Amino acid sequence: MRRLWLYLLLFPLQLSVKAQSMTAEDYYVSAFNEMSDMLAGRDTLSIKRAVYLAEWAFYEGKLDYKTDFCDEIDRIKTFILSFYEVNKLQTYKTGMQMAISSYIVSPYSGNGYTPYTYDFETFSMDKEPWERQFVSRTLKTHKGQCRSLPWMYKILASELNAEASLAHAPRHCYIMYKDEDKITPEEWINLELTTNQMQPAWWIKQDFEICDSAVQVGTYMTPLTDIETVACQMADLALGYKEKFNRYDGFTYYCASRSLEFYRMNPNAWIIRGKSLERIIQDYLARTGNIVDDYAAYLIHLMDETKLSFDKTYMTEETEGIRERRKQQAIEAQKYINEKILSR
């Protein structure tokens, strides 16, 4: 056990020593360290910064925080604040949330009369390029999908001090905020940005085939706290690392484990942790000639614990039916936007 923890503690430190030359892996270690400091309270918690760091690491530092991220977000904030005042949305308790939604889905001078719409090119690809889900890309192209659009909304909400949270469905995320203006019969607004709809909870549960247990334990349909949101971004950092280098290793294990300290009901993080342990075990046994010593036994024990914890999330496996429904819903939403909004 001691050898394992020594390895895990030294792993990021050893990489950071190499950071003077900044290899591709070093950008990930740097991003991890900064996110970890946010979660530990050693640095200011910033969802905007956390999202940027994951994208910056993937691009190996070729993404500027000010010019590629902050400047555009600040410009959008200025427009939304003006929109909020001019349209007297302060008369609503959720007026700022309404202003953010309007900016994203409707044509106004502030978005160049080009709303942020679903990126349908991803449907025709056998494998979606990882960067297609980046917020920095959506800010530039006004095209996004079920990750980048709600994450952009969450960043704007945080910057504008509007109460709104990310929530998950299987392989999907959306926005939740309390319906303080009683617009719907439910306590929470479930805002689906890919289809420009407010969806009732029962419909999300049915459409994504979510079981009661997954809702009860907080895996799906549960608003994330800001700390959980940054922890979720840390798990995404590990996924980006795996996508870029095509491997699970000590970094992805450490990244997922740190994320799970703050957001335990993230099935993706448990999957990353399990696959990373599997790789670590295989490599260790290859070095020892498949001798299962105390260290190997402990690694296997960690793997068993990981599987048990994953099972407790009651994750829904995405089916072809779910994928096809999401595709059709997005197509119908795009048709509505083209006919009812863009044609104005």
Which stretches of residues belong to each language-model region?
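Sec-dependent N-terminal signal peptides
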Residues: 4-13
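Hydrophobic/aromatic-rich core segments of domains that either
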Residues: 148-216, 227
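Amphipathic alpha-helical repeat scaffolds of TPR domains
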Residues: 222-244, 265-286, 316-336
